[in-house]
């Protein structure tokens, strides 16, 4: 099958794994994540690819090149290639779920 079709909201809510790859193609990867309360993805940089992230559930912060941005349900983050970034779950109670 070419392409990938899913109910991304349902897949994100249901995911309990830190990182689960749903689909990979030559130029794109679809991943759902669940970050435990107080957890983070860890600072990283992708030299040659931009990233798009969307928060489905929870509260957190995005840190892009040292600048912090508050996040909650429905927020999206676009991370340009070469940008140091981290996503942190600021809740003490619920997982931060995103794709």
Residue ranges and their predicted role:
Residues 20-24, 33, 41-46, 88-90:
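Short histidine-centered beta-strand/loop micro-motifs
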Residues 34-36, 45-62:
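Short, conserved beta-strand element in jelly-roll/cupin
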Residues 1-29, 42:
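A short, N-terminal "cap"/entry segment at the start of jelly-roll beta-barrel domains
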Residues 82-99:
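Ligand-binding loop in jelly-roll beta-barrel domains
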Residues 30-32, 98:
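Hydrophobic residues on conserved beta-strands that form the core of alpha/beta folds
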Residues 67-81:
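Short acidic-glycine-tyrosine-enriched beta hairpin
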Residues 29, 52, 59-61, 68, ...:
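Structural motif
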């Amino acid at each position: 099958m070419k392409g990938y079709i899913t109910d991304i909201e349902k897949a994100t809510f249901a995911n309990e794994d830190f990182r689960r790859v749903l689909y990979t193609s030559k130029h794109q990867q679809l991943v759902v994540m669940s970050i435990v309360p107080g957890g983070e993805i860890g600072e990283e940089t992708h030299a040659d690819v931009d990233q798009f992230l969307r928060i489905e559930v929870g509260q957190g912060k995005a840190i892009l090149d040292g600048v912090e941005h508050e996040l909650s349900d429905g927020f999206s983050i676009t991370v340009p290639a070469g940008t140091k970034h981290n996503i942190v779950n600021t809740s003490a109670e619920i997982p931060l779920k995103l794709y």
